[in-house]
Design a protein with these regions (language model features):
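Structural signature of tandem alpha-helical TPR/SEL1-like repeats
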Residues: 32-43, 63-73, 94-108, 129-137, ...
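Short coil turns that delineate tetratricopeptide repeat
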Residues: 47-51, 79, 113-114, 144-148, ...
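Canonical tetratricopeptide repeat
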Residues: 58, 87, 121-122, 156
Length: 407
């Protein structure tokens, strides 16, 4: 009796192993067919494995006439197949015009998968449907986790609404997203919205290295775009945020003292409200923060009119200012051809006041009193113009300090 029982167990084990071996062969063959990736081979793989969601998904791509049915079978086999739920939603929305079913499928995808694609799919759906509340809800969800550049999301946001509070509420306190948004705003000339975004950015970054978060590139270029476009007030607010957060060493300019880093002690930031030395053939501009001083050299083969050094200054139109400087000419003839020029910039092209120019840098009193012309922003430039009747300048000037004060 015991022997018969053992033989029965042995037979069952052998039979089970044989069934498992056959099933394994079926699995291997089905995978081989699937990997051939043809309409016939994938259909054969599904025939062998009718409940394999991956195979059903792929077959749906080959058999457009039966796509919807195959995708339904796929989500029945694997309810967590978010991609199939999304594809069902697209068929319902785009092909059948059934937005109710489409929304159900998209939401199911977001329910079973909490990553980027389902959230972004719902954001796009509600944008197409022009449903602002749902759109901004899923916009926030999308931006909270997106690993990608977010410009497409920002573009849809601005098309859906221009309300600043609504837009700001949709942006999460993720430094990466906040920096991308500030750059998007600058690129699309939404300059008035940048200061609030930068406030949030510096708060979110905290004590991390500001060089990693756009101080020297994206934010710097955004400042330059704002000022070049005549948006002095928002640029001042951004500068203040960066200064208060310790991202900048330069002082905060104001109407009384509109020029910064006039003693040249801080190494040039080269953006915003700090000095920008310009590279020109035949000239050289060198800063010596330890001196401190700036040395301007002309080699005799420079252009007849060039800008050597410039800074945006926060002057107020109609107010009187006095610019003073300390400069020493080294082997440069007098007149030197060097002079300060104030360039007004306006948002409305052609409406700026006239440019105004000081006397020669090395001639007479080292000061210039002027009334600021009309403008929305102002660029102070130290320019060289070859004096009439003279050869091109050759020599250098050491500039030790520059100051500007409202009178």
């Amino acid at each position: 009796m015991k022997r018969i029982l053992l033989e029965g167990i042995r037979f069952a084990v052998i039979a089970g192993a044989a069934v498992a071996a056959v099933y394994l062969l079926i699995l291997v063959h089905a995978e081989q067919l699937f990997e051939r990736d043809t309409a016939v081979s994938v259909a054969a793989a599904v025939h062998l494995q009718p409940h394999n969601a991956v195979y059903l998904d792929r077959l749906a791509s080959w058999q457009s006439e039966d796509r919807q049915n195959l995708l339904r079978r796929s989500v029945q086999a694997d309810p967590f197949n978010y991609d199939a739920w999304i594809r069902l939603g697209l068929i319902a929305e785009m092909q059948d015009g059934d937005n109710v079913s489409a929304e159900k499928y998209y939401r199911k995808a977001a329910e079973v998968n909490h990553m980027f694609l389902p959230k972004w799919t719902l954001t796009n759906f509600y944008f197409r449907q022009q449903r602002p509340d749902d759109f901004f809800h899923w916009t926030r969800e999308t931006l909270a986790i997106t690993p990608y550049a977010s410009d497409p999301v920002f573009a849809q946001m601005w098309l859906m609404s221009q309300d600043e509070n609504t837009l700001n509420e949709a942006i999460p306190n993720r430094p990466r997203v906040l920096l991308q948004y500030a750059w998007y705003l600058a690129g699309n000339k939404h300059f008035e919205s940048i200061p609030h975004t930068v406030d949030r950015l510096v708060a979110a970054v905290g004590k991390d290295d500001p060089g990693k978060w756009g101080r020297d590139d994206l934010l710097a270029a955004s400042l330059d775009r704002m000022l070049a476009g005549g948006y002095q007030a928002p640029a001042l607010r951004v500068w203040s945020s960066l200064k208060d957060a310790g991202w900048l060493e330069e002082p905060q300019p104001d109407a009384q003292h509109p020029l910064t880093n006039g003693d040249f002690h801080v190494r040039f930031y080269r953006h915003g409200f700090d000095w920008v030395p310009l590279e020109n053939s035949g000239t050289r501009v060198e800063q010596y923060p330890e001196a401190p001083a700036v040395r301007l050299s002309l080699y005799g083969d420079e252009a007849e009119k060039i800008t050597l050094l410039q800074q945006y200054v926060a002057v107020t139109p109609g107010k009187r200012y006095k610019l003073t400087w300390q400069a020493q000419g080294d082997d440069l003839s007098n007149p030197s051809g060097l002079a300060w020029r104030l360039h007004p910039i306006t948002r409305l092209k052609g409406s700026a006041g006239a440019e105004i120019t000081s006397d020669d840098l090395l001639s007479g009193t080292p000061s210039w009193t002027f009334a600021a012309p009309y403008g929305d922003a102002f660029l102070l430039a130290l320019e060289y113009t070859r004096p009439l009747g003279n050869t091109r300048g050759r020599g250098s000037v050491t500039l030790k300090s520059v100051a500007m004060n409202q009178q």
